[in-house]
């Protein structure tokens, strides 16, 4: 049957990408349908119970700046919060939280069920329908056809998923859930370029069988950080600690003894795993000189005894899993609640996507999450929001939301995917960004909220809070510039106490704050330096960073401006690169294959040299002259 209601946007999949995509589309006013094989697993944390970290926390803040759900759900479910790299530069400081799985899933479910313009329906999707080269809807397992002008596919690890434990394997999307075999086969029929990747998860341990007296405690930070601009510490549940143990030479010998039954080493697994989150057997094989690896025991929640041993993801046989776990200090009597496993799944070459995450071959079809070759909740959620928003923009025939590399980590992520592709699961790091001083956690809202508000992603209350913060920052920076001190105005002992030396000339608070050995708090101890208004910690942090890093930021802005012409210059859809004089055969082939949208994208394709970019620019200018 054909369902009687036609939707603007259909989202397939209810993981981190799918939930953000559906919420984004519905927030923008589009009639949206979220299809999932099981409503009970919406927003489920399939692997580790944590959100954020270096690079990933930056993505979460960007999501939040655009009205996304992940940061707020984390504030409602986080049972341990830490600020990483707190003593380092502002660019690499990041927030990470352990989340209660049950509370996190409940927070996402509540947002979904209370979101206007959003319908939920429980059915696996087995087919997509096309009208020529345009998407027109989907068909579910029981034959219901849902019509829509745009479809966002966020199938995660479910497309033709295969689970491995030792030499045993079976079809599945994750433990306990079926694979989307029919949909995977249908997408292959559409000739979309694809490959196989793999990821894995560790065995889970019953906390009642852990001897915590032998472990090192790792408490959260005090005061407790907050993840969302719409959140606060009062939202947080009870806070708990993580614990640290280590592998040892006995552990490593046990792991090696299972190599002959490892699906990774016996060729049973074809997919490539994540480089920066390798299985324990891969670590022992690659780093044979190391006698020990640190393992974090992370609580899964407040109402369960289950612990996640971060660092021993494995697909080794279950008897080896038991032995390796029990070889570690504090885990001698550990009971495993769930075995670790590896999962192989289909992904589609993201070089077949536009910067909007729409496929180049099928109009109105958008991909987000692990289907694009990424790994991680945060990477998936960020893509989901962007794809959901751009699906609405596509339906409305409006310009897509495109984020530049110097504007957002999400811009870096998408640009990397569509220009370089992936040969292993892609994870976000701060080192991937050329302009990371611009892309800090603390200024995500200043970079993105206005763009989100313009297209309806950001609500009125968040917009009001954003403007109050922005205006407070501007007022305080202006006040610092207009508050002056002379050597005669301050007592000599006060000058030495605050500045470490006597003032040699008149200076304002703005210039004084730029001194490397002086922070805002110390400066405010000067007589008459305190502002008349109460400023939040977030405003003070922004003010201090903007003042201290202004010189570096200005230099980066000059560099960005110098490249803007190249970055934004559009390439014609029908350009034939074999006719561009001077380009090598390799460059012509790659450009014709990948069809970059801008010269900037072309410049980042492997093998495209600066000389080739210069030839492209000449060709385009000649074309413009001929057109005139």
Swiss-Prot record:
Positions with a binding annotation for NAD(+)? 273-287
The record's section on SUPFAM superfamilies has: FAD/NAD(P)-binding domain (SSF51905)
A single GO cellular-component term from the record reads:
cytosol
List the cofactors: FAD
Q: Name one GO molecular function term.
A: flavin adenine dinucleotide binding
Which coarse location class applies to the principal site listed for this UniProt protein? cytoplasm
| Function summary | NAD-binding protein involved in the addition of a carboxymethylaminomethyl (cmnm) group at the wobble position (U34) of certain tRNAs, forming tRNA-cmnm(5)s(2)U34.
Quote the protein name from its UniProt record: tRNA uridine 5-carboxymethylaminomethyl modification enzyme MnmG
Q: What is the lineage of its organism?
A: Bacteria, Pseudomonadati, Pseudomonadota, Betaproteobacteria, Neisseriales
> Which gene is transcribed and translated to give this protein?
mnmG
């Amino acid at each position: 049957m054909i369902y009687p209601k036609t939707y603007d946007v259909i989202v397939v999949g209810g993981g981190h990408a799918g939930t953000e995509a559906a919420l984004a589309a519905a927030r923008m006013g589009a009639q949206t349908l979220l299809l999932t094989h099981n409503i009970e697993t919406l927003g489920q944390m399939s692997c580790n119970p944590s959100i954020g970290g270096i690079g990933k926390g930056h993505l979460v803040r960007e999501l939040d700046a655009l009205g996304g759900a992940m940061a707020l759900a984390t504030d409602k479910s986080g049972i341990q919060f830490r600020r990483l790299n707190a003593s380092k530069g502002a660019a690499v400081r990041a927030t990470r939280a352990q989340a209660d799985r049950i509370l996190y899933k409940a927070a996402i479910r509540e947002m979904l069920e209370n979101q206007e313009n959003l319908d939920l329906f429980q059915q696996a999707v087995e087919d997509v329908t096309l009208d020529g080269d345009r998407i027109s809807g989907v068909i579910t397992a029981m034959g219901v056809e849902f019509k829509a002008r745009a479809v966002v596919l966020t199938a995660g690890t479910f497309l033709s998923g295969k689970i491995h434990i030792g030499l045993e394997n079976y079809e599945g999307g994750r433990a306990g859930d079926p694979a989307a075999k029919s949909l995977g086969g249908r997408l292959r029929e559409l000739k979309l370029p694809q490959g196989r990747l793999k990821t894995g998860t560790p065995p889970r341990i019953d906390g009642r069988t852990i001897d915590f007296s032998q472990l090192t405690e790792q408490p959260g930070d005090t005061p407790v950080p907050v993840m969302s601009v719409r959140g606060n510490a009062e939202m947080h549940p009870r806070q708990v600690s993580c614990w640290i143990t280590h592998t040892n030479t006995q552990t490593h010998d046990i792991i090696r003894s299972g190599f002959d039954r490892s699906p990774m080493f016996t060729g049973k697994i074809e997919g490539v795993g994540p480089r920066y989150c390798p299985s324990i057997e891969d670590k022992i094989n690659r780093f044979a000189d190391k006698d020990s690896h640190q393992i974090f025991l992370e609580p899964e929640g407040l109402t369960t005894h289950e612990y996640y041993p971060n660092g021993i993801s494995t697909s080794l046989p279950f008897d080896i899993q038991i032995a390796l776990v029990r070889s570690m200090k504090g885990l001698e009597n550990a009971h495993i609640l769930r075995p670790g496993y590896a999962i192989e799944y289909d992904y589609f070459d993201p070089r077949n996507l536009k910067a909007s995450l729409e496929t180049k071959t099928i109009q109105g079809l958008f991909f987000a999450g692990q289907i694009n070759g990424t790994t991680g909740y945060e990477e998936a959620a960020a893509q989901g929001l962007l794809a959901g928003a751009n699906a609405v923009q596509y339906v409305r025939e409006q310009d897509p939301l495109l984020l530049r590399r110097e504007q957002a980590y999400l811009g870096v992520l998408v640009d990397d995917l569509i220009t370089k592709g992936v040969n292993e699961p892609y994870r976000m790091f701060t080192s991937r960004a050329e302009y990371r001083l611009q892309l800090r956690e603390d200024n995500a809202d200043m970079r993105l909220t206005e763009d989100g508000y313009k297209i309806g992603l950001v609500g009125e209350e968040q917009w009001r809070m954003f403007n109050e913060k922005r205006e407070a920052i501007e007022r305080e920076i202006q006040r610092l510039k207009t508050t002056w001190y002379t050597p005669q105005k301050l007592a000599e002992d006060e000058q030495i106490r605050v500045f470490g030396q006597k003032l040699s000339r008149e200076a304002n608070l703005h210039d004084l704050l730029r001194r490397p050995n002086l922070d805002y708090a110390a400066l405010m101890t000067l007589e008459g330096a305190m502002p008349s208004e109460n400023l939040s910690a977030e405003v003070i942090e922004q003010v201090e960073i903007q003042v201290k890093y202004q010189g570096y930021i200005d230099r980066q802005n000059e560099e960005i401006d110098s490249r803007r012409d190249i970055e934004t210059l559009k390439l014609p859809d029908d350009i034939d690169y074999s006719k561009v004089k001077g380009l090598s055969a390799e460059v012509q082939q790659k450009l014709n294959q990948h069809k970059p949208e801008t010269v900037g994208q072309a410049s980042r394709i492997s093998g495209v040299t600066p000389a080739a970019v210069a030839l492209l620019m000449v060709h385009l200018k000649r074309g413009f002259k001929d057109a005139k």
